């Protein structure tokens, strides 16, 4: 039990869809969630606004547990997806685990429709300004598109790493050198490189150098976003993964690139009206 904190799930009444799905699905009906008229809940807006001013607390549990993951800030909010949509719950969880270092290639489909519904995008940032970097590709080439993102990120990280090593050779014995050596040891570890990159940036800002070393320092600071190892993802539905984009997906898997694949398998073409895909079951009724 975590005794030093109090936990509250604060609802923003102005962004509630009013669908009632949360109440229907809640295992503690009448005790935890009850639908009420909007005008009786507007006072909760003050509580919502106050909640946004609170400082972030260190997660007292491992985020890679069912319970611990829910103490992480979601970086997907107010998506505008269909009421009761099951896709957004999974996408939200991914942002709680990896969102502040996440690159996302999204195939056309439902996840693209609610993921970039003009004029807003539901993917957001934390208080440090970090959040998922999202882009969309068509059905047939999203897997290849995501690998292009992977290769681009790898090249940019390799270039920054080379500059860090060059500056390290010129600054032996400094706080930056110690931070850089630790970062290089954990270069390919996502969460460790994130923490170590903060130490590198802080040490760089205090480092007093001139000439070639100053140019290296400026370059690293300007490209500091690439110090942290990125979590690379491709999203798509079963229409993409099983049908239209299967050929590209097959090649990407065979290439053994460091990229994660998330298939939102609804067993139909959800975004275009429920047509059957290769994931559809024989004799099923889809709605």
Which residue stretches match the model-derived regions?
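Beta-sheet entry/capping signal
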Residues: 8, 24, 30-33, 100-105, ...
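Non-heme iron-sulfur electron-transfer modules
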Residues: 1-8, 28-68, 130
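Gly-rich Lys/Arg/Thr-decorated short loops/hinges at beta-loop-alpha junctions or inter-strand turns
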Residues: 2-6, 66-77, 140, 198-204, ...
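N-terminal amphipathic, basic-rich helices that act as targeting or association modules
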Residues: 16, 68-71, 76-119
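A structural-propensity feature for long, helix-poor, extended segments
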Residues: 4, 120-171, 272-287
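N-terminal leader/propeptide and maturation segments of large enzyme subunits in energy/redox metabolism
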Residues: 139-212
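Thiamine diphosphate
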Residues: 114-115, 213, 219-287
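Iron-sulfur cluster-binding cysteine motifs and their immediate structural context
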Residues: 1-4, 8-12, 17, 21-40, ...
